């Protein structure tokens, strides 16, 4: 059998479990579009390459299979690279494929020639350029395997355009077997799990901290199970705000009391203040289970003092959690006040939030959060997506969603609309609700046309405060309001009308009392929708029993 390189590529993607390819067409990759037909791959054609990378990221987080992004070379590749950092920090399996100057033109200033693999390398787990049409199946298998293995993350492969049309004789064996695409396992030994459980049992105030790999449905189930079988608090962290993540309530108030912390796939990084005092007590000990030996080494350097890390293991996060649940179930769960202290801190929200949510005048962001929270109480299978800075922190702190996608530890904004589209495609039977600021919403507004064309349905609840508010708040704190500069946006922009013009459903909301019914109308429209909510300009909440959260306008 003779196949083109493009056919080998497309069929290998399908063999590896891919169903969708998020892409923007270009000269280099036209043969792949053709090959996708016979490989039964869905082409999701977007309006900007960055949006496609975000969509592949969200797809990977929700399905645990690598999301596939495909671009033409040169500027198309460059446009798609930026969101890779978000996917890397969020531990999202993703494969980015880029067209490339033909092999015989490399180094000769061919059309749109760039050192693409070098450009992508800092933001991915692996990056290389294909050399042979016959080996494209092996390249794809390697890319998908690396994306899935260890700490999941993005991988880049550039493919010279001449390889796509190159005929490969005897191509029957050019598409690898399914095993070649699977993750390389790194299990946690039962003996090690027993030692971890024993350490937890001996500790007086233990904690288990988990990271972004535990964000998906299976991760959430395991977090709940581990907490139940051990009786020990299990915290999930994925915010760039770290211990100040409003979703974690006042947890920062109690961390310094912990005497043992198990890092289950959670990096000891800036989000944990590197494990140092005063965030953690100087005598607090750490156990680290991580798929990356280098992450374990960095933790030891961050802590400095010898003896603070008492046990380490190189193991995959989800299987390690399964092992800990199984081994932990052999002991009776602990019952003491420490776990309730931690859970109480996480649940804590200042009493005045109720007043903020119901008062007249400008809509406070917490009112939006309460409206979305109430919707999720009625529809617990819905997917929550969060994007933006200050405004969405209030919403995140209010909404308890079983499935959520955020901008992750990388902290970049602008991916919300593409995330929501991919969530709708990955979960076609689920409702999708996005909270996003007006600044972040503007990044990929044109993708509403993509959403309508692809029959993706979601509701974006835009907090319109006419500002790049995160940076504005920094200016206020640092320089004062009279030296705030360059962060204003126009609050008069009718994002709702723009969405309507793109084929979606749009509605302007100016009163908090109208939020619930407006949200229901938007959901029932069945279209990609936008609620343009005029919100008060306030800083994100800083939740603590020791200090009141900011509640009044900062503008």
Regions found by a protein language model. Name each.
Residues 1-334, 457-460, 478:
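N-terminal alpha/beta PP-like core and its mobile active-site loop of ThDP/TPP-dependent enzymes
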Residues 4, 134, 158, 171-172, ...:
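Phosphate/pyrophosphate-binding active-site segments
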Residues 6-9, 14, 24-37, 343-429:
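Active-site diphosphate/adenylate-binding microenvironment
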Residues 32, 166-169, 296-298, 347-349, ...:
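Short acidic/His/Gly/Ser-rich catalytic and metal-binding motifs that mark active-site loops
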Residues 57, 117-118, 224, 370, ...:
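Active-site phosphate/pyrophosphate- and oxyanion-stabilizing loops and adjacent acidic/basic residues
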Residues 84-86, 144-145, 276, 375-377, ...:
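Short amphipathic alpha-helices and their capping/turn segments at secondary-structure boundaries
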Residues 97, 105-112, 255, 314, ...:
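Thiamine diphosphate
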């Amino acid at each position: 059998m003779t196949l083109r390189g493009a056919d080998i590529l497309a069929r290998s993607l399908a063999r590896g479990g891919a169903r969708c390819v998020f892409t923007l067409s270009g000269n280099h990759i036209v043969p792949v579009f053709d090959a996708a037909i016979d490989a039964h791959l869905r082409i999701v054609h977007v309006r900007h390459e960055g949006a496609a990378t975000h969509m592949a990221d969200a797809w990977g987080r929700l399905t645990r299979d690598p999301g596939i992004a495909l671009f033409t070379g040169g500027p198309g590749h460059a446009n798609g690279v930026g969101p890779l950092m978000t996917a890397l920090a969020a531990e999202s399996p993703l494969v980015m494929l880029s067209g490339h100057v033909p092999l015989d033109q490399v180094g000769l200033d061919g059309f749109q020639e760039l050192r693409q693999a070098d450009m992508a390398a800092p933001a991915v787990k692996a990056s290389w350029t294909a050399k042979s049409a016959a080996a494209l199946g092996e390249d794809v298998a390697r890319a998908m395997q690396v994306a899935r293995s260890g700490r999941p993350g993005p991988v880049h492969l550039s493919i010279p355009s001449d390889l796509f049309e190159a005929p490969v004789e005897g191509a029957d064996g050019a598409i690898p077997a399914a095993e070649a695409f699977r993750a390389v396992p790194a299990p946690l030994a039962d003996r090690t799990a027993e030692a971890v459980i024993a350490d937890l049992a001996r500790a007086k105030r233990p904690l288990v901290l988990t990271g972004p790999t535990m964000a998906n449905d299976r991760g959430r189930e395991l977090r709940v199970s581990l907490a139940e079988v051990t009786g020990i608090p299990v915290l999930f962290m994925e915010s760039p705000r770290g211990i100040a993540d409003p979703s974690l309530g006042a947890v920062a108030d109690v961390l310094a009391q912990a005497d043992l912390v198990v890092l289950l796939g959670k990096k000891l990084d800036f989000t944990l203040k590197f494990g140092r005092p005063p965030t953690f007590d100087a005598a607090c000990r750490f156990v680290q289970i991580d798929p990356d030996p280098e992450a374990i080494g960095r933790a030891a350097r961050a802590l400095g003092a010898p003896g603070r890390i008492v046990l380490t293991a190189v193991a995959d996060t989800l299987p390690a959690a399964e092992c800990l649940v199984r081994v932990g179930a052999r002991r009776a769960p602990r019952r003491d006040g420490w776990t309730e202290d931690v859970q109480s801190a996480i649940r804590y929200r200042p009493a005045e939030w109720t007043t903020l949510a119901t008062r007249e005048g400008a809509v406070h962001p917490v009112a939006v959060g309460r409206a979305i929270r109430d919707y999720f109480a009625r529809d617990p299978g819905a997917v929550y997506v969060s994007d933006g800075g200050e405004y969405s922190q209030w919403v995140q702190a209010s909404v308890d969603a079983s499935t959520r996608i955020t901008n992750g530890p990388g902290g970049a904004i602008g991916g919300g609309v593409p995330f929501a589209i991919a969530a709708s495609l990955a979960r076609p039977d689920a409702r999708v609700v996005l909270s996003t600021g007006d600044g972040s919403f503007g990044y990929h507004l044109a993708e509403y046309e993509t959403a309508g064309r692809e029959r993706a349905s979601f509701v974006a609840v835009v907090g319109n405060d006419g500002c790049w508010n995160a940076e504005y708040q920094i200016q206020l704190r640092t320089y004062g309001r009279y030296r705030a500069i360059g962060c204003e946006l126009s609050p008069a922009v009718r994002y709702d009308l723009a969405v309507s013009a793109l084929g979606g459903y749009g509605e302007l909301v100016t009163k908090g009392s109208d939020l619930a019914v407006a949200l229901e109308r938007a959901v029932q429209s069945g279209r990609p929708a936008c609620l343009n909510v005029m919100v008060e300009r306030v800083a994100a909440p800083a939740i603590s029993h020791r200090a009141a959260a900011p509640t009044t306008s900062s503008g």
